[in-house]
UniProtKB/Swiss-Prot annotation:
This is Adenylate kinase. PANTHER family: NUCLEOTIDE KINASE (PTHR23359). ATP binds at G10, A11, G12, K13, G14, T15, R127, S135, Y136, K198. Consists of three domains, a large central CORE domain and two small peripheral domains, NMPbind and LID, which undergo movements during catalysis. The LID domain closes over the site of phosphoryl transfer upon ATP binding. Assembling and dissambling the active center during each catalytic cycle provides an effective means to prevent ATP hydrolysis. Some bacteria have evolved a zinc-coordinating structure that stabilizes the LID domain. AMP binds at T31, R36, E57, L58, V59, G85, Y86, P87, R88, Q92, R159, R170.
Length: 215
């Protein structure tokens, strides 16, 4: 089963990807992870990517798609894969389709986790962090004492990019970027939109039901 997973920040995409990996035994392919791995290992494409990254520039699509193609050709992808964070644009989706045709691994289904903005803003802007690594949520998992970490007694804080205004900006960027891709895969008849506001386990049961139809 070859899957693309879409979902805005805070929709629970990472949680569902992990559940898919555990249940189906197929790898989650994160473009950020494989890019860093190629740079670290000094592969030809990794060195090409590093030249752009060192200048603070975006890695061009032709380099990125080469890295993805190599990753999808690895042994652990034989039974399927979950693509997370790619494609981000319609030209990338076209390039992906070309390489998947070449290696005979077409996308079976595109899962789109949908959650209203106000719910996402509440989920993300409620996050609190501590320098010791502990994390809290003002509603779902608040510290026992206001603004004090249960574990180390340090002060908990909100990251700047988790503040409501910053979250809304991130969501606006995501929608602007992703909507053309939603339309793209909808036209191909492989897009399934799921309600991401439900309980984590219920969402996963919904995903399994969808995948059973596409298997």
């Amino acid at each position: 089963m070859n899957i693309i997973l879409f979902g805005p920040p805070g929709a629970g995409k990472g949680t569902q990807a992990k559940k898919l990996v555990d249940f189906y035994g197929i790898p989650q392919i994160s473009t950020g992870d494989i890019l860093r791995a190629n740079v670290r290992e000094g592969t030809e494409l990794g060195l090409a990517a590093k030249a752009y990254m060192d200048k603070g520039e975006l890695v061009p699509d032709n380099v990125l798609i080469g890295i993805i193609k190599n990753r999808l050709n690895e042994e652990d992808c034989k039974k399927g894969f979950i693509l997370d964070g790619y494609p981000r644009t319609v030209p990338q989706a076209d390039a992906l389709e070309t390489i998947l045709d070449e290696i005979d691994k077409p996308i079976d289904v595109v899962l789109n986790l949908e959650v209203p903005d106000e719910v996402l803003v509440e989920r993300i802007s409620g996050r609190l962090m501590c320098k010791c690594g502990a994390s809290y949520h003002t509603i779902a998992n608040p510290p026992k004492k206001d603004n004090i970490c249960d574990i180390c007694g340090g002060e908990v804080y909100q990251r700047d990019d988790d503040k409501a205004e910053a979250v809304q900006n991130r969501l606006d960027v995501y929608k602007k970027q992703t909507q053309p891709l939603i339309n793209y895969y909808e036209e191909k008849g492989i897009l399934v939109t799921l309600d991401g506001t439900k309980d984590i386990n219920v969402v996963f049961e919904d995903i399994k039901a969808v995948l059973a139809k596409f298997a």
